[in-house]
Amino acid sequence: MKRSKSRSLSPSSNVITLKKSSKKDKKFMVIIGNKTVHFGAVGYSDFTIHKDIDRMHRYETRHKSREDWKKSGIKTAGFWSKWILWNKPSLISSIRDTQKRFGIRIKYVR
């Protein structure tokens, strides 16, 4: 008997949870299914803090050759750093943009 390739997932399994990291040296973590990704080094600034566009562009230039910022990189710290910490001047606007850009749902737990 053949199994259907398209399995319906419960709505909660499609949600990515974003919250403060449980690691002392990281700012945030995302939970994607059974994988947890910690990102953003504590003690370092990011675009949501300094809001300096020139610094944001330097960050992008420095990291673009080694990071996967496409949806295929969704389970990497580099993906989340780029789209949450270095995308827009506020965390909430970055979350909204990331959801729209990649067609995902992010639940931010404060």
Regions found by a protein language model. Give the residues of each.
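Arg/Lys-rich, low-complexity, intrinsically disordered basic segments
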Residues: 1-110
